[in-house]
From Swiss-Prot:
Protein task: Catalyzes the thiamine diphosphate-dependent decarboxylation of 2-oxoglutarate and the subsequent addition of the resulting succinic semialdehyde-thiamine pyrophosphate anion to isochorismate to yield 2-succinyl-5-enolpyruvyl-6-hydroxy-3-cyclohexene-1-carboxylate (SEPHCHC).
Pfam families, per database record: TPP_enzyme_C, TPP_enzyme_M_2, TPP_enzyme_N
Quaternary structure note: Homodimer.
Annotated gene: menD
Coiled coil: none
Record keywords: Magnesium, Manganese, Menaquinone biosynthesis, Metal-binding, Thiamine pyrophosphate, Transferase
Pathway terms, separated by semicolons: Quinol/quinone metabolism; 1,4-dihydroxy-2-naphthoate biosynthesis; 1,4-dihydroxy-2-naphthoate from chorismate: step 2/7; Quinol/quinone metabolism; menaquinone biosynthesis
Domain of life: Bacteria
Annotated source species: Yersinia pseudotuberculosis serotype O:1b (strain IP 31758)
Entry EC number(s): 2.2.1.9
Any GO molecular function: manganese ion binding
Record's protein name: 2-succinyl-5-enolpyruvyl-6-hydroxy-3-cyclohexene-1-carboxylate synthase
Record's cofactor remark: Binds 1 thiamine pyrophosphate per subunit.
Cofactor: Mg(2+); Mn(2+); thiamine diphosphate
One GO BP annotation of this record: menaquinone biosynthetic process
């Protein structure tokens, strides 16, 4: 028996089965134990192979590919700590819904817990975070090809949200052997190899709790009431649909930076602090929230405190998604589908004064930031930097809060982020995956600590298939902690942790373009030139450390003093 050859037969069938469920992209890290999987991936013409030397970044690369393609994406890593490095991306996928298939090569059972090199207990390593887990046996011809392909088909049919962990033990040898051996084992599947469908076509009907197909019977009653719409994270087309739907109802729409609604009432994080705006919103009889992962502090505070007669939350992801635990309805359904089943009725807007508060807040922002070249000013004017027919990736921490509070992105413009666990790890890798999946011009904006955290992902950005700009806002540390009541004496050393770096040499190391503009006109011109010439350019904007946080706090205070608007 040639173990190496049968390992490869087994792996080839495994990967072919995954392609029948829509897997096109596969991300591969170097390793010996994963050789059967790697060689099978390289030989499969249906797969696009991506490589990276850092498994943590590799997992986030796959996450970005899955976000932008909305398809399942596979990952191959070797045994040992390489597997554990996938944990952050797996956690994020579980919270935001991207489908990742983690193929983790493993030592065979007899090499576990006996001191063998690079052998750890991989089964169950990820605890409850994967949606599904499959622990495959050591490959052997005694196990039929039908069993393997049926097992994979069943798991993939159940995977609607989050990650699937497939642990794959392989015994040595891993190389060499007569490639013609065990052809009969593969051939036992007959003409399936020439087909394009799964071997086992399993249909999974969701439980009744998740079955939103019937229209809410009392919708025709509630659509005549005073309603408020909250828009969280959703797709571009859903954002456009929701904006038109809410406008027809005459209901105010408070849109998150990730809602892609165009934020018809911009600067909500500011004007929601105004007492009169809160009084107006308190008159709402029903609140409908579409999507989750809200960014704005003031919106979250209002969302927690509001007490409408009904609170409905619509999102395709499972789970409650409401930290405030409102009494109401949790409808697990795609936003677009729900809107089409619940038509709007044209009604006169009931909260017109909110538009006045929004306009006043926006005017205050423009006046305060006039002539500045600052973190807040870049966030406010970010829409001017976006490429035509492109996309935006927004990092976490302070920058996304500033864009949400001070900016206004175009309706339907694709925006991506990692706002499930909201970590700063893997952001550059995720942005690289988003760009590769779509081949669109991409603007990614992150802070300096986020860039440092994932610095070796600059290697992934060398391979952009369309112009890409990585905008690093260097405020010298984690200045989001300047927004929090952290102890002032310990703030810099233990929270902000300034690193006093610039990124010019990092860009040179990875053969990227680099610029460090000193004014808004320079920044705008640099970015415009990047869209024309292609490749990836790292543009660093150095700003005073705490200015962005201080500006946001100042604007919140100023907006609360806006004169009352007559209803």
């Amino acid at each position: 028996m040639s173990t190496s050859v049968f390992n490869r037969r087994w792996a080839a069938l495994l990967l072919e089965a995954l392609t029948r469920h829509g897997v096109r992209h596969i991300c591969i890290a170097p390793g010996s134990r994963s050789t059967p999987l790697t060689l099978a991936a390289a030989a499969n013409p249906s797969l696009v192979c991506h490589t990276h030397f850092d498994e943590r970044g590799l997992g986030h690369l796959a996450l970005g590919l899955a976000k932008a393609s909305t398809e399942p994406v596979a990952v191959i890593v070797t045994s040992g700590t390489a597997v554990a490095n996938l944990y952050p991306a797996l956690i994020e996928a579980g919270l935001t819904g991207e489908r990742l298939i983690l193929l983790t090569a493993d030592r065979p059972p007899e090499l576990i817990d006996c001191g063998a090199n690079q052998a750890i207990r991989q089964q169950g390593l990820f605890a409850s975070h994967p949606t599904l887990s499959v622990n495959l046996p050591r490959p052997t011809p005694d196990i039929s090809a039908r069993w393997l392909v049926s097992t994979l088909d069943s798991a993939m049919a159940q995977l609607q949200h989050g990650a699937l962990h497939i642990n794959c033990p392989f015994a040595e040898p891993l190389y060499g052997g007569d490639e013609q051996q065990y052809a009969d084992w593969s051939a036992s599947l007959g003409d399936w190899w020439q087909d394009c469908h799964p071997w086992l076509r399993q249909t999974c009907y969701p439980p009744s709790l998740y079955q939103p197909l019937a229209q809410q019977a009392d919708w025709f009653f509630w659509r005549q009431k005073r309603g408020v719409v909250i828009a969280g994270r959703m797709g571009a087309e859903e954002g456009r649909q929701l904006t038109a739907w809410a406008a027809m109802l005459g209901w105010p729409l408070i849109g998150d930076v990730l809602s892609q609604t165009g934020q018809p009432l911009p600067c909500a994080d500011l004007w929601l602090a105004h007492p009169r705006a809160q009084e107006t919103l308190a008159q709402a009889q029903i609140v409908l929230q579409f999507g989750s992962s809200l960014t704005s502090k003031r919106l979250l505070q209002w969302q927690t405190a509001c007490q409408p007669q009904e609170y409905w939350l619509v999102d395709s992801a499972p789970g409650r998604l409401d930290p405030a635990n409102h009494r109401g309805r949790r409808i697990i359904c795609p936003v677009g589908e729900w809107l089409s089943r619940h038509p709007a009725q044209r009604r006169t807007p009931w909260a017109t004064e909110l538009a006045a508060y929004s306009e006043s807040a926006q005017a205050q922002v423009i006046e305060t930031l006039a002539g500045q070249f600052s973190e807040a000013a870049v966030a406010h004017q970010l829409a001017e930097l976006l490429p035509d027919n492109g996309q935006l990736f927004v990092g976490n921490s302070l920058i996304i809060r500033l864009i949400d509070a001070l900016g206004q992105l175009p309706a339907g413009y694709p925006v991506y982020s990692n706002r499930g666990a909201s970590g700063i790890d893997g952001l550059l890798s995720t942005a690289a995956g988003v760009q590769r999946a779509t081949a669109k011009p991409t603007l990614a904006i992150v802070g300096d600590l986020s860039a440092l955290y994932d610095l070796n992902a600059l290697a992934l950005l060398r391979q952009s298939s369309a112009p890409m700009v990585l905008l690093v806002i260097n405020n010298n540390g984690g200045q989001i902690f300047s927004l929090l009541p952290t102890p002032e004496a310990e703030r810099q050393r233990f929270y902000c942790m300034p690193q006093d770096v610039n990124f010019e040499h990092a860009a040179v190391m990875f053969s990227l373009g680099y610029a460090r503009p000193n004014s808004w006109p320079q920044l705008r011109e640099h970015v415009h030139q990047c869209w024309l010439r292609g490749g990836t350019t790292l543009i660093e904007v150095q700003v005073p450390p705490s200015q962005g946080a201080e500006t946001l706090q100042q604007l919140v205070q100023q907006v609360t003093l806006i004169p009352q608007v007559a209803p």
